[in-house]
């Protein structure tokens, strides 16, 4: 399923997960895909829930974001009879806000996701969750450069997926330009592990 890689490495699959935000410029992060409070994605998710008729959007909106009351409501939703609906809503939002925009941007740059393995779809999902859909083309074009091709249209075929996945994770995302966090080595360890998981599924 699209989202498996991101779910595993962002929160280990838990829709009720709340990070403490320590050392993270994104602040406290929530859910399966660790929606950032400081970057605005948490607030956008709550607004999306309300706009799309999810009653628990109004429930969360009763409280200040990141407050103890908000956190309690979030955890209750993830561990109650509504848990599956809450998890499904997080996934639908991630597709809407991250994956679909990334796919559209890549298509404009000559990379059509329907020409690739389902694992590549999961890679696009994961990279757009972590870095935002606005950087996906730059990331993939840089990866293509490491592969020795001038642009994405040259590798718009499933036969290039293995090498592209390696280049995205181990060349681009692991570079100092893309990963200069205080916990750089830990993040790079994630990239190595996630890359191998993706390759094993091809």
What are these regions (language model features)?
Residues 1-114, 119-202:
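Cell-wall polysaccharide-cleaving catalytic domain and substrate-binding groove, primarily
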């Amino acid at each position: 399923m699209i989202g498996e890689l991101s779910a595993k490495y962002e929160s280990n699959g838990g829709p009720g997960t709340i990070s403490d935000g320590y050392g993270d410029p994104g602040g406290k992060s929530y859910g399966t895909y660790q929606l950032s409070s400081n970057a605005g994605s948490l607030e956008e998710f709550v607004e999306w829930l309300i706009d799309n008729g999810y009653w628990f959007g109004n429930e969360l909106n009763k409280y200040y974001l990141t407050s103890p009351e908000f956190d309690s409501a979030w955890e209750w939703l993830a561990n109650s009879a509504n848990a599956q609906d809450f998890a499904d809503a997080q996934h639908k939002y991630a597709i809407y806000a991250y994956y679909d925009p990334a796919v559209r941007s890549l298509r404009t740059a000559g990379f059509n996701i329907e020409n690739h393995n389902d694992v590549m779809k999961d890679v696009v999902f994961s990279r757009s969750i972590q870095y935002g859909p606005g950087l996906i083309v730059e990331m993939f074009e840089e990866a293509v450069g490491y592969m020795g091709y001038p642009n994405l249209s040259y590798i718009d075929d499933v036969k290039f997926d293995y090498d592209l996945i390696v280049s995205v994770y181990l060349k681009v995302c692991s570079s100092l330009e893309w990963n200069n966090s205080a916990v750089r080595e830990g993040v790079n360890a994630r990239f190595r592990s996630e890359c191998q998981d993706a390759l094993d599924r091809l």
